[in-house]
Regions:
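Catalytic phosphate/metal-binding cores of nucleic-acid and nucleotide-processing enzymes, i.e., regions
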Residues: 9, 27-31, 43
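Short, extreme N-terminal segment that most often corresponds to the first beta-strand
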Residues: 1-26
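Low-complexity intrinsically disordered segments
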Residues: 39-113
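A cross-kingdom marker of C-terminal helix-rich interaction/assembly modules
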Residues: 34-36
Length: 113
């Protein structure tokens, strides 16, 4: 049985801008997001603006691609949604992006259920 999850990507002041559904989020940990941010940093280079850690929808799109590429057939269980409300999810994460370009990864929290 999979553990469904949602990941909300918000602006620095908490406004929802993009959301992702992950069918198998049971194995997600803070290290999962650290690995994702490290991949973005490695692949996008050292210029903070290019990392887009301040751009929720851009970062959400990269997260979908990263999820789809990290495990065999993982692309079958990840997708873009309008928001976490109304989705039956066992786990809900929020990625709060920065106000301005930064090389520091965004803050990730797991919402209490």
């Amino acid at each position: 049985v999979s553990t469904k999850g949602t990941v909300a990507f918000t602006t620095w002041d908490g406004e929802l801008e993009a959301a992702v559904y992950v069918h198998n989020a049971g194995s997600f940990t803070p290290e999962t997001f650290a690995e994702f941010f490290a991949t973005v940093a490695r692949d996008c280079g050292p210029v903070p603006h290019d990392l887009r850690f301040h751009h929720p929808s851009y970062l959400a799109a990269k997260f979908v691609v990263w999820c789809a590429c990290t495990a065999s057939m993982a692309f079958r269980g990840v997708g873009v949604i309008t928001g976490p409300e109304g989705w039956h999810a066992n786990r809900r994460f929020t990625v709060r992006c920065h106000q301005e370009a930064s090389a520091v990864p965004p803050q990730v929290t797991e919402d209490e259920r």
